[in-house]
From Swiss-Prot:
This is Tabersonine 16-O-methyltransferase. Pathway: Alkaloid biosynthesis; vindoline biosynthesis. GO terms for molecular function: 11-O-demethyl-17-O-deacetylvindoline O-methyltransferase activity; O-methyltransferase activity; protein homodimerization activity. Its EC number is 2.1.1.94. It catalyses: 16-hydroxytabersonine + S-adenosyl-L-methionine = 16-methoxytabersonine + S-adenosyl-L-homocysteine + H(+). It comes from Catharanthus roseus (Madagascar periwinkle). The keyword Secreted does not apply. SUPFAM superfamilies: S-adenosyl-L-methionine-dependent methyltransferases, Winged helix' DNA-binding domain. Homodimer. The keyword Cytoplasm applies. PROSITE patterns: SAM_OMT_II (PS51683). Coiled coil: none annotated. Expressed in leaves and flowers. Detected in stems and roots. In leaves, expressed in epidermal cells. One of its GO terms (biological process) is alkaloid biosynthetic process.
């Protein structure tokens, strides 16, 4: 290849950009841990570099203060803050962008947990073990297990910081989904008398649905240690159990970000359990998950979906699925039909499945 050609320069640019992409993620995580988005927001107007540095709590060490500019420059160049240099001023002014606003602690739908989880050293070690996982013949079913000697859930149960990052991410996501469901997708719950939210955790989504549909009995179905200390109130009940064995009967079963954690064989088992739990007439399963390539023209979306698919492989030996793969699962589990509502949010779709 001619080293002076545009083709070579373009190839160089792509390799350098991708090889350095982790630096952006690490810098964003650093900004979140230092409280930079919240500090800018608390200032109430564009903030100078020195004002920002002096306002950080806990403070940065005085010897490191001169280097905050380097971090802010990376954030600004990647759209996580705006940087403005006014005429006659020696310092730039920084403001939040839409991307950094959804990292604020006060924002109910914040994505802080996603940033902290994806850039967690625990996760990075799993990715570092991916090539070993491909090459080895040990009994580890995931790259995460190759790295840590335990599966994702087992490790999280023993390491609270990792679990807290993940739980924060899931709680914020449930807030987002709740808002979408009781808004644009409210029609899904009309006419239902009962619903079971599988893996519903502390019941964020079930409570939101129950509040807007008082006649609807909502059951949060999760593992015993998850629901052990949760109190059932009004039309929200917490029930312990195993979705592979038996699911409580209801008009509808709700699965948010559950099936992408499991391989095809296990997904069919889960779906068969769901089918047994709903009536043959009028029953349905509501799934929130990715449908890969739902919009092939959106390159940013496709790249994010394929990255998430790799994350499912690394952590769970599972996957994201295209419509054809979803249809296969539904048929294998004995369902007659389904309907996809694309683009529930940036990456996911909503699927109704009928017995």
């Amino acid at each position: 290849m001619d080293v002076q050609s545009e083709e070579f320069r373009g190839a160089q640019a792509q390799i350098w950009s991708q090889s350095c992409s982790f630096i952006t993620s690490a810098s964003l995580k650093c900004a979140v841990k230092l409280g930079i988005p919240d500090t800018i927001d608390n200032h109430g107007k564009p903030i100078t570099l020195s004002e920002l540095t002096n306002a950080l709590v806990p403070p940065v060490h005085p010897s490191k203060a001169p280097f905050i500019y380097r971090l802010m420059r990376v954030l600004a160049k990647n759209g996580f803050c705006s940087e403005e240099q006014l005429d006659g001023e020696t310092e730039p002014l920084y403001s939040l962008t839409p991307s950094s606003r959804i990292l604020l602690k006060k924002e109910p739908l914040n994505l802080r947990g996603i940033v902290l989880t994806m850039a967690d050293p625990v996760q990075l070690k799993a990715w570092e073990s991916l090539s070993d996982w491909y090459q080895n013949e040990d009994d580890s079913s995931t790259a995460f297990e190759t790295a840590h000697g335990k599966n994702f859930w087992g490790y999280s149960s023993e390491h609270m910081e990792h679990a807290e990052f993940f739980n924060e991410a899931m709680a914020s996501d449930s807030q987002l989904i709740s808002k979408l469901l009781i808004g644009e997708y409210k029609f899904l719950f009309e006419g239902l008398a009962s619903l079971v939210d599988i893996g519903g955790g502390t019941g964020t989504i079930a409570k939101a649905i129950a509040k807007n549909f008082p006649q609807l009995k909502c059951t949060v179905f999760d593992l015993p240690h998850v629901v052990a200390n949760l109190e059932s109130k009004e039309n929200v009940e917490f029930v312990a159990g195993d979705m592979f064995e038996k699911i409580p009967s209801a008009n509808a079963i709700f699965l948010k970000w559950i099936l992408h954690d499991w391989n095809d064989e296990d997904c069919v088992k889960i779906l068969k359990s769901c089918k047994k739990a709903i009536p043959a007439k009028g029953g349905k399963v509501i799934i929130i998950d990715m449908v890969m390539y739902s919009d092939k023209k959106d390159d940013h979306l496709v790249k994010t979906q394929t990255s998430m698919d790799m994350a499912m492989l690394v952590n769970f030996a599972a996957k994201e699925r295209c419509e054809k793969e979803w249809a296969f699962l539904f048929k294998e589990a004995g369902f007659s039909d389904y309907k996809i509502y694309p683009k529930l949010d940036f990456t996911r779709s909503l699927i109704e499945v009928y017995p």
